């Protein structure tokens, strides 16, 4: 009887999201875009530090280690922001957590821009990191709980798209402020303005999020079924669709334990937690933020000597990153998550190896006497193909999968663990790259990053599920029923 009921629910859900429901309400896209502005703030900070670092180092006579800490301090602050977000988000809601993050981001940007020493700047960036961590935790979670299942992958991918747009906007701003802008008679190098200008988008995010509806799943978690129905009525097409979704959420809420309690006693939930941790480790160990944080230094290592060449090359990196993200948005709900990931890892692995092999040595650059060797152009081409591979796959899709694989009662805990892992790994990458580049050389450093992509393909084959077109509640049901991880999306 229970099996027949499940079949009936599946048939009803398919009918509700059938041909007549292919067109989604415009409000769905407006809500998703506004929530994804959290990704814009994240991207702006990744991009802005790339261009500002050279001038910060000059202003404070910062050592290599201090420069690494300027980059990584925000990332370790983001770990703290992520860890407290699970508690805040569950108690006060996804929307309110995003509002708090916007306020902290504004304050952090202001304080960073008026720092009077390298130590104070590092401390301010830790504070700013709390906001970035809170936003990176909450935005994909909110998007997954708002989105219809038929376009869930695309809408969550909008978060990564906004990250890439933020990066390219910051690169453009940095290029203008570092090369052309005249202030108090000084042309270029205005790192304080680079950092302080981030106040503007954080205020825009606050205003936009203020008008968003609350997550219907969070409302149901708080026993507010009528409010959840009202929200769903604005973003779903039919009463049948709303009724089915509410029924699924109620069934999922029959699991009364919280995330930590589930982790201690439920081995199936533990598997999902470790999968999420593994996925976020993978995203960072691809080496993407090596390129994003240190793009000007990579261009310099390749033989592009002038600041203008380095900054405009960095802008082009950001533009390619944005454009390639549209590949994931277009195909993640058509082709599925895993086929795109396999292709992306292959492209990234080959590209990093090309970068490592083709990167000219110091001796070659010295012998070139100011001319850029052909090998330098090959290595930079490898950087661009790597960006395409990442932006079309691991960039958005890992955020998608990590927002899908946890049951509602443990979703805050699960996303806390996976997102905190992302920031820890991100911080380690940011803190070690310049040291690796100096100690191992460019060739060995990039070959190491290229080699690990093969391991990631094996990881996806063995453990990662395909979640295309499956409701969050069905994925949770399969997980808690003890299905193997790679089959919880079937």
Locations of the language-model features?
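Alpha-helical transmembrane bundle of multi-pass membrane proteins
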Residues: 2-227, 231-233, 244, 253-490
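Short helix/loop segments within enzyme catalytic domains
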Residues: 233-239
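Boundary/linker segments of alpha-helical solenoid repeat arrays
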Residues: 239-245
């Amino acid at each position: 009887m229970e099996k027949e009921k499940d079949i009936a629910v599946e048939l009803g859900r398919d009918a509700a999201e059938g041909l007549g429901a292919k067109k989604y309400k415009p409000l769905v896209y407006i809500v998703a875009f506004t929530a994804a502005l959290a990704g814009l703030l994240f991207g702006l900070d990744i991009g802005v530090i790339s261009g500002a670092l050279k001038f910060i180092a000059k202003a404070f006579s910062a050592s290599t280690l201090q420069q690494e800490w300027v980059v990584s301090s925000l990332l370790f602050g983001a770990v703290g922001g992520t860890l407290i977000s699970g508690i805040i988000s569950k108690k006060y809601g996804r929307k309110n957590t995003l509002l708090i993050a916007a306020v902290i981001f504004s304050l952090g940007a202001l304080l960073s821009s008026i720092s009077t020493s390298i130590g104070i700047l590092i401390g301010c960036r830790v504070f700013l990191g709390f906001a970035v961590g809170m936003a990176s935790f909450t935005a994909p979670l909110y998007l997954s709980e708002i989105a219809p299942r038929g376009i869930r992958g695309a809408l969550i991918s909008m978060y990564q798209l906004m990250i890439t747009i933020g990066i390219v906007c910051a690169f453009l701003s940095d290029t203008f402020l570092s090369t052309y802008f005249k202030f108090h008679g000084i042309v270029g190098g205005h790192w304080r303005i680079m950092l302080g200008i981030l106040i503007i988008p954080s205020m825009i995010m606050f205003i936009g999020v203020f008008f968003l509806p609350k997550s219907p799943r969070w409302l149901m978690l708080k026993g507010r079924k009528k409010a959840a129905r009202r929200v769903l009525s604005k973003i779903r097409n039919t009463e049948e669709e709303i009724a089915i979704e509410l029924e699924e959420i109620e069934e999922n809420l029959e699991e009364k334990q919280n995330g930590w309690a589930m982790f201690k006693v439920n081995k199936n939930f533990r598997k999902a937690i470790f999968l999420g941790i593994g996925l976020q480790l993978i995203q960072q160990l691809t080496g993407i933020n090596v390129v994003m944080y240190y793009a000007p230094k990579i261009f310099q290592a390749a033989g592009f000597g002038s600041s203008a060449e380095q900054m405009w090359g960095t802008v082009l990196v950001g533009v390619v990153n944005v454009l390639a993200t549209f590949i994931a948005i277009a195909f993640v709900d058509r082709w599925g998550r895993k086929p795109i990931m396999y292709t992306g890892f292959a492209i990234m692995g080959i590209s990093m190896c090309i970068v490592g092999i083709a990167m000219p040595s110091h001796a070659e650059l010295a012998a070139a006497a100011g001319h850029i060797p052909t090998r330098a152009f090959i290595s930079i081409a490898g950087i661009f193909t790597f960006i395409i591979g990442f932006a079309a796959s691991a960039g958005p899709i890992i955020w998608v999968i990590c927002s899908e694989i946890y049951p509602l009662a443990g979703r805050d805990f699960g996303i806390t663990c996976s997102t905190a892992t992302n920031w820890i790994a991100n911080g380690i990458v940011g803190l070690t790259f310049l040291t690796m580049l100096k100690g191992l050389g460019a060739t060995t450093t990039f070959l190491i990053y290229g080699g690990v992509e093969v391991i990631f393909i094996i990881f996806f084959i063995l453990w990662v599920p395909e979640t295309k077109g499956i409701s969050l509640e069905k994925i949770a049901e399969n997980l808690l029923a003890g299905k193997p991880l790679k089959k919880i999306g079937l």
